[in-house]
Amino acid sequence: MNKTWIKEHWLEILLCVGIVIQIGALAVFNLTRLPYESNYDSSCAYAQIVEMWRQKRILLKDWAYQTTLGIDSPVLLGALFYGITKNAFTAFGLANIVTVIVYACLFYDILKQADVKKNMRLLAVLFLLTPYSTGQLGYMPMLFTSAGSYAYKLLVPLLLIDILVRMHKGQEIKKYWYLILFATFFVFDTAVSSGEYILLCAVLPLIGYEILHVLIGNDIKQIFNKRLGFLILESAIYVVGIKVGRRTGIIESVGSQMMLTNCLLYTSPSPRD
């Protein structure tokens, strides 16, 4: 590495250093601070991985589930790490670190496939890993620390977007078959655990985008394309997952279902005289 190369790529180097520092900070937090910032939700997740390893089951016996089955979060990976470390906090911290790295790589790949400049890709990843908010329902605890309750849910639309971008570019499926495999797994996993939430908020909007893309192209014949076919197939798998989740008899995932209400029911009361 010579001085000329460093001079030409100084911003790229700086952004890479920033990302490494950010991942390192998240790793240190996950390995040292989880016992001190535990809350009701995260405590349930920590206890769940202990029971999953003890019972050697994904769906636990004699367990009071909350709003979801929790398997669309780092608990599956956490249970495996618990079998090695025998420490729930360390195990979940390691699972969260893996999640952070997966997000950084996946987000970078989406932007790369979309032909975004390299420096902008690195900057976007740096922003992705920035701890915008903390607290029980903050950005970081929901994705990269604590119980990571939305970590795997959000992987569903990100994986689907990565695949769709590749399809738009005309790449052969053999180059990204593994992404389709992971996307299908997380689609089914999330459906079983959390009900129709991600289907309504992530998968169906992507179908809407693809339909709009065809309409803008003014060629209705293009409506029968592999991108829409892929999304419809994933939606069907999602619906099957919902049915499977409900047939477990453990939980209805009511807390994760979308409840649509009439906004007129919440109008302000008339001012007093």
Task: Indicate where each model-derived feature is located.
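Start-transfer (signal-anchor) and selected internal transmembrane alpha helices
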Residues: 1-26, 230
